[in-house]
Amino acid sequence: MRIVLGEIFGLKIYSYGFMIGLGIICATLLFLKRGTQRGYNEDKLFNATILTVISGILGGKILYIITEWKTVMQDPSLIFRDFGNGFVIYGAIIGGALGIALCSLKNKWNVLELADLVVPGLALAQGFGRIGCLLAGCCYGAETTSSIGIIFPADSLAPAGVPLYPTQIFSSIFDFALGLFLLWYGNKNKEKGKTMSMYMIIYSIGRFFVEFLRNDPRGSVGLLSTSQFISIFILIGGILLYNINKLKGRKETGEK
C-alpha cells in the first residue's frame, strides 16, 4: 500500500491516478472493440471516448466538491493542487452519462445501445480504480476485530495501526465480477438498454450495502451516505429502464 508508486523525470506517479488511468485504457479498448463489432465507426467512437472521459472526470470532481464543500471552502486550492485525487464515482458516472448522451445526439446513435457497450468496461475500470483506493488508503472501512481486517501504514490516507474492513477489496472484486457478468449478459441479450439497466440495478445495490462498512468522510444525506442516497435513485432508474418496453406496451427490436 503506497500513495506514490515512483517518479518519472521528476514527476510523481500516484497509485490512485495510475490505476484510474489503467482502468480507462482497458475500458476504452473494450468499448472500441465491442463498438466496431456492432458496426460503429472507430474514429467516432474514439472521439466519443475522449469526451466521455473528460465529462466523467469533471463530474467526479464536481460531486466531490459538493460533498466536501466545507473542506473545499476552507482551502479552495485543493481543487487544483491535488486534481488527481478527490473524486466521487457517482459524479463520474453521471458526468460520463451526459457525455454519452451528447455523443449519441451528435452522431445520431441510439443512446441506450451505446450505453450498453460502455458499462462492461466501466465496471472493469471501477475495479482498477478500487485497487488504486487500496494503494492510496482512501475509501477505507470501519474498524473491525475480524480476521479479514487490514492495517494501513502511517503514510496512508486511512487511519494507521488499526484493522479496518477491506472495503476497497470488496468493491474491486464486486466491480470486476460485475464487468464480466455484463459482458456475458450483453452478448446474450441485445435488447437496447438491458445491459445498462442491469449495471444500474446491480451496482447500486452492491454500493448501497458496502457503504455500511465504510468509515471515510464522504458526505451524508440524513442517515444515509451521499452514495447510498444516490444509489436509491439509480436503482429505481435501472428498474424502470429494464421494464421500459413493458411500460410502453411494446418491445423495441429495430436496428440502429
UniProtKB/Swiss-Prot annotation:
Transmembrane regions listed in the UniProt entry: 11-31, 46-66, 83-103, 142-162, 164-184, 221-241
Record GO terms (molecular function): phosphatidylglycerol-prolipoprotein diacylglyceryl transferase activity
The keyword Secreted appears for this protein: no
Keyword ATP-binding: no
Gene Ontology CC, one term: plasma membrane
Pfam family, one: LGT
Binding site for a 1,2-diacyl-sn-glycero-3-phospho-(1'-sn-glycerol): 130
Class of the enzyme per the UniProt entry, highest EC level: transferase
Main localization category: membrane
Localization per Swiss-Prot or TrEMBL: Cell membrane
Keywords annotated in UniProt: Cell membrane, Membrane, Transferase, Transmembrane, Transmembrane helix
InterPro entries linked to this entry: Lgt
Membrane topology reported for the UniProt record: Multi-pass membrane protein
Pathway field: Protein modification; lipoprotein biosynthesis (diacylglyceryl transfer)
Gene Ontology BP annotations: lipoprotein biosynthetic process
EC number: 2.5.1.145
Family under the similarity heading: Belongs to the Lgt family.
Function (record text): Catalyzes the transfer of the diacylglyceryl group from phosphatidylglycerol to the sulfhydryl group of the N-terminal cysteine of a prolipoprotein, the first step in the formation of mature lipoproteins.
Name by which UniProt lists this protein: Phosphatidylglycerol--prolipoprotein diacylglyceryl transferase 2
Gene that specifies this protein: lgt2
